[in-house]
Amino acid sequence: MISASGCCFLALDTGRIMLQQRSKTSSHPLTWSFWGGKSEKKERPIETLLRECNEEMGILPDIEKVYPLHTFLSDDKKFTYNTFCITVFEEFIPVCNSESSGYAWVGIHAWPKPLHRGARAVLEQPDMVEKIITIYNRQKDKLDLPNWLDSF
């Protein structure tokens, strides 16, 4: 089975999410997607996620918490994709490698276009968006931060 992991970053200071724009030479070129990639042998999903993010953006920011968000299993059961939401205290600027053409911090429901089909399948599901909002609200309450989502 082929396995992969990816994530969006959720900034607790703004309530915005960071997505990656895939490079012109990648599969699904110039679509907006999650950071991540394929697992190496015997790698757990979280290990894949952290390795891939480190490769794609040079250095990881201080991570507040990692939340499982969604798991996709193909109909033929030969491919699985684990999506996570990583909370960070504040927005940061990634140092993108050649797999990315750029990045964007965006508000909930203000997704850039075109979305990669996998990202679209997660971000356009109301229950997944609600889960992201719940993650944000729980974390910002713990840290006594203002609720930026009220402005979206």
Language-model features: locations:
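Charged phosphate-binding loop/patch that engages nucleotide di/tri-phosphates or the phosphate backbone
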Residues: 120-152
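Conserved acetyl-CoA binding element of GNAT-fold acetyltransferases
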Residues: 31-37
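Short strand-connecting beta-turns/loops that link adjacent beta-strands
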Residues: 12-14, 25, 76-77
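A conserved beta-turn-beta hairpin within the catalytic core of GNAT-like acetyltransferases
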Residues: 26-30
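Short loop/turn segments immediately following the C-termini of beta-strands
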Residues: 22
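Unchanged
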Residues: 37-125, 150-151
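Conserved N-terminal beta-strand and adjoining loop/helix that marks the start
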Residues: 1-18, 38, 85
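Conserved catalytic motifs of the protein kinase core domain
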Residues: 15, 31, 79-81
